[in-house]
């Protein structure tokens, strides 16, 4: 028996040595990830990248065999053929192939496609997963390989096929009914619906006015007490009557209570909460956040960035405990494991956290450092003690009335997690800072009135969505998953259904009534209201497409239905439902709707709105979506005389433009004269009035009147335009529509979020990718900050 045991141990050791010495090929998705992993593995391992998916549905074909159980027809794209041939050659040389793509459904599908296309042998192929790129995680994964999880692959395939069916069948309907080259997507259409409905809510909102009363009292010992009245007044007269009743009134502390409060930290980051906080605290777009997080993950600095779990590993919990203890002491530690609330949370992921909690900072670009710091602070705070506060509430009675004032004081007695991190909100004004002390007060104490004010306020319309608040809403409704939030928000902007923009505020007057001494004074002040920055706004095309889909495809546009489809994908991922059965059920309900909508003949074109009659011709005036965007039309196609068209101005919308505004657009074009035997005209279009000459268009500035502009002025504008012709777009990026590489008067530059960044002369602008663009931006920002710092130093001298 002992001899057999000895031989068995020897054999195991030989097997282990063989595995170390053999030729191993590890395949991951990205070169950056490959580079990091290669550092952790020995010389027996070669790590190569597949550069994402190596096989997909054909881009311009339907590529689904409906009759053959919804079989997808895949192809290897032209730009991936050389990658595939390299991987095939290396796989043939390898004794063992390790498929190490990401651990989610998309990653599982990449591994499955690699297995199929490279024609790998199951006996010499292993699937490994990890949610952080650290040496211990990689070695542990190699010790615990598994097979490809076909349920996860099917869930990814189901999403891809279902979305292809919706896109390919719906888009031709939109081309025929609205305008050519439109496209529709399942989750995107529902996201557009949210934005359109919010815009209409805002337009329909009727603001109501009320008067809020606040007071400043003196305690007679040199301290002030600020308090608010418990009720609001509907009219100025009521507010004034109350203030006048306070002239002779006495103000007494009727009751005073002090109670302890505790505030607990937020859970560690999921994809959606990271996107929201990075938008609020750092001003990053959703796409930007994901791109930076991807780099941090691939460099082994944070865990996997697509997750809806708030769990932390035991190792993360213990290392957080050690860091908190060494930095702040035992009393700041409180180990917590948060419960994942999101329905259908995918796979056994962890929350997004630093791989090594001991690293408070990292090397890298300024953007990477800031996002890492945010993740580090949020993770650390989640494992810290509650903040302890003391809240004091004093009720102040007013003699001769039942009304009461309330004064509130709040003081932090132990900062706990607040020492490290404070969560942000979409509307910071809603989170009023009550951290103010009240002086020592006693029940029955008389207070002296200093002043009482009644300020006119207005009820607010709901705010427009930001990228961050839209992500939160989508998650709340159960629509989409961590991997889909960023692409959804990018796609609806690329398709021109939604645009990110600012709304200029309007000036509004409001009353302030003040009682000081025995006199009530009334003053009128003004404020700007309704101004918004970087909000998601529906375009006319987005609104019209939304209305059409709501009418003919209510199921596709239903929030609950979209969420239920996500749940079905989850069921497929868990092996509880066959993906083909899910497809069949969906298609049987969806396809007949497509055929019905194509067959319906409507009297008016979709989105058309009648404004009235043109007094000059007696013909109908309407607005609709034309081939190149929203237009005003005088007359109809049935008339002998062709209808006249004018492009709708950018500041007008199909839903709100008036007859008068529409008719004004027909006062142009007017002819100014000729230059070099070619006519110069003034016209108006989507973006306002312009001068046109030989297919050259120049916008007329707001300071000039298009009805009085002269030929000489137009000639000067055309000359300036020719000089500025260098303003040509060198490159744009679909995933970040706000960013462009342009050629300007002083050379090439990057235009991003209404700011320009010079491109160094050593760099070829056309070769820049999105990642290097952001590095150039960071570099220029840093230079700007250094210049500012130097100028401040000079001023101090």
Please name every model-derived segment.
Residues 133-215, 258-262:
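C-terminal or mid-to-C-terminal helical accessory/interaction module adjacent to the motor/catalytic core
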